[in-house]
């Protein structure tokens, strides 16, 4: 038992010894590990502290550098501003010095001028006293001279003044008359030159392509047998056609042709159209003739309207009343001294427009007035009154512009022109009518008119010779200078003009020129 206990005790002691050893070893191991961890932590902490110090040192240096840069920049700005202010102050000081010098010079100049003015004032005062003394002497002398003149001439002062005034007034009146005459001649010369330029330009830019109209129309036939069918049994067909149209049919020996004669172009056109339709159809009898005449009349009415619309389009005049357009188209079938009135109106419109453009007037209004100036001729054979009166009534009825109405009323001189456009229309009308080839007359009428023109001119006292020239558009009268003076020459021209207007019918205008010539001849021996 005791040995067992001893063994157990020994075993316990051994176990205890191993436990102590293991405990010591474990303690040492843990201590070593702890020390290693502490050393590692201390090293890491030291490393972090070193890094923080280095970073702080770096940031500090950067901050110091930034502060130094900012300080340097502020110092530079301050120095630059100081330099600029110093320069500006120096400039201001320099300017002030210059101004002071200028003021000093001005002050010196003013002082000199003041001295000069004082001297001049003294001189003027002296001269003033001398002038006053001289004026006093002159006044005394004038009084003495006036008294002497009144005594010698026997005229009072007022009478002498009146005589001098009359002489001066006469001299001024004479000089004024000469000046007025000179300026009037100059104005006329300038106006004539400018008007000739405008008229020549208008004529050059306006070309006429129409020819004189005739009073007959010719209808071609397929053969001469058709003439008998047109005449009809006992002439009933030709009588029906003449009765319905008012046109004379001339059927003679002219091969394959029938001549239509009549003064009314519209009726002649209706007859021509109807006859052509009858010839083409072949059925010719009174009933068919009446049908074709009615159809042709409607077609001609439509053609008239188309002519009116085409004319307004070509001329560039718009806004006309439809009835006025149709009346305008009727002018296509009207003639004046052989000149087609519609073509004449278009020509007048173009001429008036060109001249209005040159003078800065309303071109459209001038063209409108020129186109409508002869509108009364379209129906003057149907309505009583002259074509001027009828035209004014039509323009008023269809509410045309007052300038257009005045242009229609005044283009033949029946009414006074109230605008430049009215005058331009009258001039354009005269240009179109006077253009060579525009209008024609028979030879007998032409010769008789020229003889009558010279006869009227020679019927006045003091007329020596007369010459009708320019195809009767001008008459030149040579007068006796011992009977007709310059003033009477103007009156004679007006009197001859009035008598020509009263006794002659003529197209366009006639220029009356009175020539007075005085010759003084001497012979040197």
From Swiss-Prot:
Subcellular location: Cell membrane
Top-level class of the enzyme under EC nomenclature: hydrolase
Cystines in this chain: none
Record keywords: Cell membrane, Endonuclease, Hydrolase, Membrane, Nuclease, RNA-binding, Transmembrane, Transmembrane helix
Main localization of the protein described in the UniProt heading: membrane
GO molecular function: RNA binding; RNA endonuclease activity
Stated name of the protein: Ribonuclease Y
Chain's gene name: rny
